[in-house]
């Protein structure tokens, strides 16, 4: 045996013990009553489920199953938006797709909602991408799921994470990305980075790094973590229109939920550092499976989907609906960003298109 080969063999004491990493679940406190921001459907069965990710964090999910189904079902895992919980729009998507014949789960990310993980309110491009793959783990072993027919829906900031997961996890056979944010891009460059030159972007990134690392020191000294991203209770008149749109969803009866980070005090501030340093779309151009991007025509965030589509196809859509190979961009006329959370009172979510997409590609 060569010295190089010997280095690849575990020491005898480890071989003898056959040591393995054992998967253990946390005990979670799960709400038993219906506490969603959307009405309960009588067309599906609902139950709470839990599963564990590769980092040992137990995730909580709502599972929806069509009533009176037979055989194994195609399945879809849903998450988002970034800072939202499953009782908000991801659950609405999951329940609606279950009405249309899919077994679905809407899950809370690590450190969020009813899911486990300490400290609370953390975000991570790695761990949150892993959350999607953990959902696929769970769905793959369900007796009523065909493991070769699993897809995902990522909403808002979980759209970028969904693309990251699809680039990594070949078990994901189709991905729908709704009203997408690329959290790495917006964290590193701020909003509307296409309006800035590279020198400005570099200078702003360095200034932000210095502030965030100073915050790390302060957090450690204080023994607490500063939070950011929650929609304020009192919105200033000069707030941007898209922030007012977030307020209209997260802070009103339309979408408020007591466990939602966006509806309350937000998420860990210094987590921005890892998002700045780890681009989510690095291998988007290597995704071989079908991807459907859906965005509102009037959404401030539309450029994220256009950028992702160009990254995957090499074609700039210039704000138009377009199909290149098995990648499709659908622009919803007149819709703003949050209209694709719950329909915005105008049925903006193209559920017929989603049903057609997943029916065609989870076959």
Set out the residue ranges of the language-model regions.
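Catalytic histidine-centered segment of alpha/beta-hydrolase-like enzymes
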Residues: 335-347
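Short beta-strand/loop motif that positions the catalytic acidic residue
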Residues: 287, 293-295
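Conserved alpha/beta-hydrolase
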Residues: 96-116
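Catalytic nucleophile-loop/oxyanion-hole region of alpha/beta-hydrolase
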Residues: 86, 112-147, 344-350
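N-terminal cap/lid segment of alpha/beta-hydrolase-fold proteins
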Residues: 23-71
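Alpha/beta-hydrolase-fold enzymes
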Residues: 164-251
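Short beta-strand element of the alpha/beta-hydrolase
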Residues: 72-81
